[in-house]
Regions:
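Alpha/beta catalytic cores of nucleotide-metabolism and tRNA/nucleoside-modifying enzymes
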Residues: 1-11, 26-31, 35, 170-241
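Conserved N-terminal beta1-alpha1 strand-loop-helix module at the mouth
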Residues: 2-94, 98, 127, 136-146
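Short, surface-exposed connector motifs at secondary-structure boundaries
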Residues: 42-48, 102-104, 123-128, 178-180, ...
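Hydrophobic faces of well-ordered beta-strands that scaffold small-molecule active sites
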Residues: 17-23, 52, 71-75, 104-106, ...
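Alpha-helical membrane segments in multi-pass integral membrane proteins
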Residues: 149-156, 167-174, 182
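Short, basic, helix/turn surface patches
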Residues: 72, 76-90, 101-103, 132-138, ...
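Glycine-rich phosphate-binding active-site loops on the catalytic face of alpha/beta enzymes
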Residues: 24-26, 46, 75-79, 99-113, ...
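Active-site-adjacent beta->alpha loops and helix N-cap segments on the catalytic face
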Residues: 30-34, 53-72, 83-89, 108-124, ...
Length: 241
């Protein structure tokens, strides 16, 4: 299917007040294959997701052929010359758009980078797509919007060395964005429907939920850890009849 054919403002209107689901798999895990990612994307759309967030050109191509909802696209590249790894180069921007993304997610943290943020966001706009700056702090959000980002998200909160104390959704950062009057997308460690609703109460335009829905290994581990913890307390076990 081609990218969603709509004006940029209309595309955002379709996402406002809704949930996007991030369909990704860690390298080496059983679901790490374009066909599996596409099936995952179809499944979450059937469940009510208004859009999907997809990593990698091959996965983007497969998902674009499978769903007709907006796609947030990115490429993760670990490099030795920068800590920035979400769509770090202009070539990555080109690849993400060519593979069918409607919105391009770009690491917009203040860490040393290979390409100027303004040039990255301009490259997205020149191809009639929207850009999302993934940030970890209020100042980074401001800088991303000033550089031309169409959206900012809390994606990187808790994933930089200066914001690594996050254990749940970045509610504090969301409150800062709201007080500053900056529209934002909530993403990162949203594990429950109640946390999802709280993001909207704090002013999120839309939310992105990932591992709580699309990582069976992580979901299973949460259950297994609780079961193991209970099993370690034999005095709480019921006697079999």
């Amino acid at each position: 299917m081609p990218p969603v054919q709509t004006k940029q403002g209309d595309l955002l209107a379709t996402l406002d007040g809704t949930m996007v689901v991030s369909c990704q798999a860690e390298p080496g895990l059983p679901l790490d294959a374009p066909g599996h990612i596409a099936a995952m994307a179809r499944s979450v759309v059937l469940g009510g997701a208004s859009g999907v967030r997809i990593e990698g050109a091959a996965n983007l191509t497969a998902v674009r052929a499978a769903v007709d909802v907006p796609i947030i696209g990115l490429i993760k590249t670990k490099r030795g010359d920068t800590e920035v790894y979400i769509t770090p180069t202009l070539d990555d921007v080109t690849s993400v758009i060519a593979a069918g993304a409607d919105i391009v997610a770009i690491d917009a943290t203040g860490r040393p980078r290979l390409a100027e943020l303004k040039a990255m966001f301009s490259a997205v706009a020149a191809r009639a797509r929207l850009s999302m700056g993934d940030v970890a702090t209020l100042d980074e959000g401001r800088r991303a919007l000033d550089a031309g980002a169409d959206l900012i998200s809390t994606t990187m909160a808790g994933y930089t060395d200066y914001s690594s104390d996050q254990h749940g959704p970045a509610f504090g950062l969301m409150e800062e964005f709201a007080r500053a009057g900056l529209p934002f997308v909530a993403e990162g460690r949203i594990w429950t429907p109640q946390e999802a609703v709280r993001c909207f109460e704090l002013g999120a335009r839309f939310i992105v939920v990932g591992g709580a829905i699309t990582r069976p290994d992580a979901i299973t581990r949460r259950f297994a850890d609780e079961v193991a913890s209970w099993s370690a307390r034999p005095q709480l076990r019921r006697n079999p009849r």
